[in-house]
C-alpha cells in the first residue's frame, strides 16, 4: 500500500476536552470529501482509503492510503492505523469488513453484521418485507421462464446506482433480452411497475442512544439520476409521520451507529412505498449543507465518533438543490463553471474531479429565494459542465 500525507506531523486532537478518534473512510469520492471536511471542522482527523491515488478526497484527507477494498490484508493494515472505520459506499463485501474488524478490534459503522441485512436489493427487500413495511412487488429471476409479460424493471441486486443496473422493460420479449444480457452479472430481480406522484427521501442518524431525522425532501429524477432535490416537499403531516414511523422501525431493528437514507415512492392515495436505502450520507442530503445548521455529513461523523448528535435546525424556509451533471467528455473548467453559476442566494460545491463525462456528478448547487426554481432550471439548461 502507498501512504500519502497532507501534513508533516499528526498531533493529538481534542474537542471540548474529549480526545477524538481517528476516523478511517473507505472510499474517496465526493461523499468522503464532505465527511472529511465536516469532521476536521469538529477538530478530528480523517484517514482515507481508496485504490485511485487521484481520487477527490486525497486533497483534504489527513492521510491518504492507496489500496483495494477487496484485499483483506490491505484492509487490515488500514484498520490498524485508525480508531473507527466508516463507508462512503455500500459496494464493499460485508464479510470482508467483519473479518478485518475482528482481526484488528476496530469498530466499523454501520456495523457490517447489521448492514449486511440491506447490502443488496434482494436482502434489503426481504428485510423490509419482514418488518411489514410496504415495498414494490418483486420476485427473484433465476431463469427466463420466470419472467412475465408485464411492464416493470429488471434490477441487479448489487452494484446499482444512478440508474446503472436498472432496466425498464415493457413486455416479456424485452425482459428476456435484458435478462440474458445481465444474468451473468449477479442476482436479478423483477420489480412491478408502480404508479406514483412523487419520489421522496428521508435521512436518519443514530449514535446508539439517540436518533435524529432530517425531514422529507422531494427528489426529481431524470434518466435514472437525481437532478433536483426540493424542500419543503409539499406533503401532509400524516405522510411525514408515515416516513418517520417506517424509518424508526428500521433504525431500531438495525441497531447500529451511522447515518442512513431512505427513498420512498408516494402513491396517488398518499401512501408511502419504500424503494431502497443507503447506509451512508446520500445525494439527497447535500441540501442539508445549507438548509440546516448541522449537515448530514457532520451528524454522520458525530455518530461514528461517539459525539452528541445535533438536532438540525432550519436556516431557510425553502431550498432547491441542483446536481451538476457532466454535459460533455473532457477536462473540467472549474473557474468558468463557478463564474457561469454566480453567487447570489446560492452555494456551489464542486467535487474536485479533473475530468467531466456525460452525467458524471461534478458538484451541486443549493439555491434559496423566491426565484430558486427558475435559477435552478437556468443552471441546468445553460451551464456547460
Protein language model annotation of sequence segments:
Residues 2-119:
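ATP-binding N-terminal substructure of ATP-dependent carboxylate-amine bond-forming enzymes
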Amino acid at each position: 500500500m502507498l501512504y500519502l500525507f497532507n501534513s508533516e506531523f499528526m498531533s493529538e486532537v481534542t474537542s471540548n476536552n474529549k480526545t477524538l478518534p481517528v476516523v478511517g473512510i473507505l472510499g474517496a469520492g465526493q461523499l468522503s470529501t464532505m465527511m472529511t471536511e465536516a469532521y476536521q471542522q469538529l477538530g478530528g482527523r480523517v484517514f482515507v482509503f481508496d485504490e485511485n491515488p487521484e481520487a477527490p478526497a486525497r486533497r483534504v484527507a489527513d492521510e491518504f492510503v492507496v489500496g483495494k477494498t477487496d484485499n483483506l490484508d490491505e484492509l487490515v493494515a488500514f484498520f490498524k492505523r485508525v480508531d473507527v472505520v466508516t463507508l462512503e459506499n455500500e459496494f464493499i463485501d460485508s464479510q470482508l469488513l467483519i473479518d478485518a474488524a475482528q482481526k484488528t478490534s476496530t469498530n466499523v459503522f454501520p456495523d457490517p453484521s447489521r448492514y449486511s441485512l440491506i447490502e443488496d436489493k434482494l436482502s434489503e427487500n426481504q428485510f423490509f418485507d419482514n418488518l411489514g413495511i410496504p415495498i414494490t412487488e418483486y420476485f427473484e429471476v433465476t431463469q427466463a421462464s420466470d419472467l412475465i409479460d408485464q411492464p416493470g424493471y429488471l434490477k441487479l441486486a448489487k452494484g446499482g446506482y444512478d440508474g446503472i443496473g436498472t432496466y425498464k422493460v415493457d413486455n416479456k420479449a424485452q425482459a428476456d433480452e435484458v435478462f440474458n444480457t445481465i444474468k451473468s452479472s449477479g442476482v436479478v430481480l423483477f420489480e412491478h411497475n408502480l404508479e406514483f406522484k412523487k419520489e421522496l427521501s428521508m435521512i436518519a442518524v443514530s449514535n446508539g442512544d439517540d436518533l435524529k431525522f432530517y425531514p422529507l425532501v422531494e427528489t426529481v429524477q431524470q434518466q435514472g439520476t437525481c437532478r433536483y432535490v426540493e424542500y419543503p416537499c409539499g406533503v401532509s403531516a400524516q405522510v411525514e409521520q408515515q416516513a418517520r414511523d417506517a424509518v424508526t422501525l428500521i433504525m431500531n431493528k438495525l441497531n447500529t451507529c451511522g447515518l442512513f437514507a431512505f427513498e420512498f415512492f408516494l402513491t396517488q392515495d398518499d401512501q408511502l412505498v419504500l424503494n431502497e436505502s443507503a447506509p451512508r450520507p446520500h445525494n439527497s442530503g447535500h441540501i442539508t449543507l445549507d438548509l440546516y445548521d448541522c449537515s448530514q455529513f457532520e451528524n454522520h461523523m458525530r455518530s461514528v465518533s461517539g459525539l452528541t448528535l445535533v438536532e438540525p435546525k432550519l436556516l431557510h424556509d425553502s431550498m432547491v438543490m441542483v446536481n451538476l451533471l457532466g454535459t460533455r467528455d473532457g477536462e473540467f473548467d472549474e473557474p468558468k463553471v463557478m463564474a457561469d453559476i454566480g453567487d447570489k442566494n446560492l452555494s456551489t460545491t464542486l467535487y474536485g474531479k479533473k475530468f467531466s463525462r456525460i452525467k458524471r456528478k461534478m458538484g451541486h448547487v443549493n439555491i434559496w429565494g423566491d426565484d430558486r426554481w427558475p435559477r435552478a432550471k437556468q443552471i441546468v439548461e445553460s451551464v456547460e459542465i
